[in-house]
Amino acid sequence: MIQYIASDVDGTLLHGHATTLNPELFDIIRQLKEHGIHFIAASGRQYKNLQRLFAPVKDDISYVAENGSMCVHDGKIVSLGHIDTDLIYEIADAAKEYGHCHTLISTARTGYTDSQDPDYIDHIRNDVGYDMDIVQNVRDIKEPFIKIAVCDFDGTEKRLRAYFQEHFGDRIKIVTSGNIWIDFIAPNANKGSALSNIVSSLGMDPKNGITFGDQYNDLEMLQLSNISYAMTTAATGVADYATHTTDSVEKTLRKFLQTL
């Protein structure tokens, strides 16, 4: 029995340079709810941004935000990760040393950057739609850290990920999140463990779901549920962790609804 649906956002529900979700998805989520099936948005994005993306159904779904570092149900934080302050500083300093990249540091309240690059700031605030404050120095931030991400507009696979993996891979988990981001994940936090926590708190069996994803930060989530779909455009090897592939979450869920 399927009790929940969980889906990644970027590259899974949002494709290319799209900044808004397919309106059909909201109708599908409402139909799922009528059948007692709960929808969870699972993303590396911040919670407030996900609420805006899913505005028509924002109070009907749950959220696994910041790649599992922050889970919210019914407006209440279910779980919250934490990354050591000094480690955040080290990563931010390394990003500056590397050059040609930008950091986005997440707290439960908002995002921060010390980048002064106008194109990056415009991309985050207007294209992605994040809440983000600009600081001169990350050491000026006085809130607990739940995630740090690094952006390279030229893509992360060629050099950026290898650089940070070499310097920090033995101290913190590093995953690709979309094509231009790498995320540094709080200890014991990932989409799979976060999803398990949130559905278990709702009295559901974590195996009784359908999950969708396309990147390496989705692997634990895809392995959690009995039924899982990797996008046909997924990163190399991701499909090996899923039971099926699809080119459209909406199309797959429409077919699923027809079986109910």
Map each language-model feature to its residues.
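Residue-level signal for inorganic ion chemistry
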Residues: 32, 67, 148, 222, ...
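Mg2+-dependent phosphoryl-transfer enzymes with acidic/Ser/Thr/Gly-rich catalytic loops
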Residues: 1-4, 22, 183-260
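Short active-site oxyanion
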Residues: 36-40, 59-61, 147, 207-209, ...
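Short, acidic loop-to-helix structural element flanking the phosphoryl-transfer center
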Residues: 19-37, 80-87, 129-132, 188-200, ...
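Asp-based phosphoryl-transfer active-site loop
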Residues: 3-18, 222
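Short, structured coil segments at secondary-structure junctions
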Residues: 56-59, 67, 168-170, 224-225, ...
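Conserved acidic, metal-coordinating active-site core of Asp-based
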Residues: 94, 100-212, 220-221, 233
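Active-site phosphate-binding/coordination module
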Residues: 23-119
